[in-house]
């Protein structure tokens, strides 16, 4: 088959419609623009909030992609927003400390952790600086495709392109239209609550001195974790800015309430007898609407395909493979999707767009699916620890896993290396065997990344 060079003139530029202005959509826009494709992005909301939600971590396998944006310009832009997550200090509910552990793959110089809203806003501003057309308040109400093009319907108008990328997130309406599939839910028996506190909330409250006070400000920022029966609590600090975000996973006995105070009351009920209960309550009580999320944790059955029947439309990111927060890879896998898609379109060229999307799916589908499995495995591993005496005997059991096949992976190098092999397998009707997953195709707790 013919592999195209990166150079393209106006008539050969691939026109791409991207739906959704989250991490997946913005990464796809930036990556595709960087490969010379013509991109337009549609988002139903009328504005972006500069700060929203809790924190999100991008692992080294995604950061190696965004590190190239503007020859490092983007990473310099977000550096002031980053939390230092080099280490984790872990204790149990009695106050017993298991020690401090290195956080591989998310540490300084490898990955980064920021407020979710701030990351999306920074990506949006960077994309706009590149001249990428972004249309806010433009809800996509329909999708369509022919053998030669694909498009969307916005405000009653049909807009055409060579392909459509649906990156609408976990609640995507386009997923069913494009793939003909519903993402089935299976509850895990657990729920999670998360919150973000900035200096406007924390700076005047002495009750938070135990985590952000002057004495603590001298200490190194890190991730603090507490393990207890049926509850796991974590706090990540940015002491120089008086900021933190927290995360609590708990059994369904603490099912999220309809209001913030009700949810927190239920969590505190599950933390009866905890040595740090009163301290953690001071953090949770500062939760505000717009910066607090509480949800039942459910796994989503993998989609059989991410493609439309004529293969000119594809779903990526959470719309395709939403993972539990415990995977630590939701945003990172979206970036891998985006980078792989851009390269496949570059190599296939305008005449083989359908093949490019098919190769993207082949290179990414199984990998994303196993990462989804990992989210559940990590959640169950953390939540099912009930023998705390055994943990004291071997504290390394509480170390966060860091599999090399996930965190040390270079999705761009892999896409360039494997494109022809995957394309020929598709054209010949043969199975493509990916090499970016464990040999047995299963997730396991590994501690071997750089």
Swiss-Prot record:
Catalytic activity field: cyclo(N(8)-(alpha,alpha-dimethylallyl)-L-Trp-6a-(alpha,alpha-dimethylallyl)-L-Trp) + AH2 + O2 = okaramine C + A + H2O
Traits of the deletion mutant: Abolishes the production of okaramine B and leads to the accumulation of the cyclic prenylated tryptophan dimer cyclo(N8-(alpha,alpha-dimethylallyl)-L-Trp-6a-(alpha,alpha-dimethylallyl)-L-Trp).
A cellular component term, taken from the record's GO annotations: membrane
Record-annotated membrane-spanning stretches: 14-34
InterPro entries cross-referenced by the UniProt entry: FAD-bd, FAD-dep_Monooxygenase_BioMet, FAD-dep_OxRdtase_2_FAD-bd, FAD/NAD-bd_sf
Keyword check for Ion transport: no
Domain of life: Eukaryota
Pathway in which the depicted protein is active: Alkaloid biosynthesis
One MF annotation (Gene Ontology) recorded for this entry: monooxygenase activity
Lipid bilayer topology: Single-pass membrane protein
Active-site feature positions: 194
Listed EC numbers: 1.14.99.-
Location of this chain's protein in the cell: Membrane
Binding site for FAD: 43, 116, 318, 331
Keywords, sorted A to Z: FAD, Flavoprotein, Membrane, Monooxygenase, NAD, NADP, Oxidoreductase, Transmembrane, Transmembrane helix
Pfam families, per database record: FAD_binding_2 (PF00890), FAD_binding_3 (PF01494)
Main location as per UniProt: membrane
The keyword Transcription regulation is assigned to this record: no
Job of this protein: FAD-dependent monooxygenase; part of the gene cluster that mediates the biosynthesis of okaramine B, a prenylated indole alkaloid that possesses an unusual octacyclic ring system, including a four-membered azetidine ring and an eight-membered azocine ring, and that exhibits insecticidal activity against silkworm larvae. Within the pathway, okaC performs indole 2,3-epoxidation, facilitating the formation of the hexahydropyrrolo[2,3-b]indole (HPI) moiety of okaramine C.
Family to which the UniProt record says this protein belongs: Belongs to the paxM FAD-dependent monooxygenase family.
Name of the protein described by the UniProt record: FAD-dependent monooxygenase okaB
Organism: Penicillium ochrochloron
């Amino acid at each position: 088959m013919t592999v195209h060079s990166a150079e393209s003139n106006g008539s050969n530029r691939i026109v791409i419609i991207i739906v959704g202005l989250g991490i997946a959509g913005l990464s796809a826009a930036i990556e595709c623009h960087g490969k010379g494709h013509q991109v337009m992005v549609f988002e139903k909301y009328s504005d972006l909030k500069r700060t929203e939600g809790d924190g999100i971590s991008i692992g080294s396998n995604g950061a190696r992609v965004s590190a190239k944006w503007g020859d490092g310009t983007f990473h310099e832009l977000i550096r002031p927003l980053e939390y230092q997550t080099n280490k984790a200090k872990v204790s149990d509910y009695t106050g017993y400390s298991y020690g401090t552990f290195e956080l591989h793959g998310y540490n300084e110089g490898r990955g980064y952790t920021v407020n979710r809203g701030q990351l999306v806003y920074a990506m949006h501003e960077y994309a706009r600086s590149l001249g990428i057309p972004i249309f806010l308040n433009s809800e996509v109400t329909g999708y369509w495709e022919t053998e030669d093009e694909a498009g969307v319907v916005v405000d009653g108008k049909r807009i055409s392109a060579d392909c459509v990328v649906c990156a609408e997130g976990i609640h995507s309406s386009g997923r069913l239209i494009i793939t003909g599939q519903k993402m089935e839910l299976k509850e895990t028996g657990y729920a999670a609550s998360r919150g973000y506190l900035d200096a406007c909330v924390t700076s005047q409250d002495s009750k938070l001195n135990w985590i952000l006070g002057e004495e603590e400000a001298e200490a190194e920022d890190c991730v603090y974790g507490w393990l207890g029966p049926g509850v796991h609590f974590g706090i990540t600090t940015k002491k120089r800015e008086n900021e933190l975000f927290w995360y609590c996973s708990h059994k369904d006995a603490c099912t999220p309430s309809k209001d913030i105070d009700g949810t927190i009351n239920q969590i505190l009920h599950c933390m009866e007898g905890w040595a740090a209960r009163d301290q953690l309550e001071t953090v949770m009580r500062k939760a505000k609407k717009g910066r607090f999320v509480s949800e039942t944790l459910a796994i989503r059955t993998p989609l059989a395909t991410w493609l439309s029947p004529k293969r000119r439309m594809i779903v990526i990111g959470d719309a395709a493979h939403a993972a539990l927060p415990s995977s630590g890879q939701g945003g990172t896998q979206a970036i891998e999707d985006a980078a792989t898609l851009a390269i496949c379109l570059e190599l296939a060229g305008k005449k083989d767009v359908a093949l490019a999307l098919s190769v993207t799916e082949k290179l990414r589908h199984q990998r994303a699916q196993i990462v989804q499995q990992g989210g559940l495995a990590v959640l169950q591993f953390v939540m099912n620890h009930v023998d705390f005496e055994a943990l004291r005997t071997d504290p390394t059991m509480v170390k966060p896993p860091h599999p090399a096949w996930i965190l040390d992976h270079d999705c761009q190098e892999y896409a360039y290396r494997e494109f022809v092999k995957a394309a020929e397998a598709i054209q010949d009707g043969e199975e493509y065997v990916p090499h970016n997953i464990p040999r047995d195709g299963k997730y396991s707790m590994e501690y071997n990344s750089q």
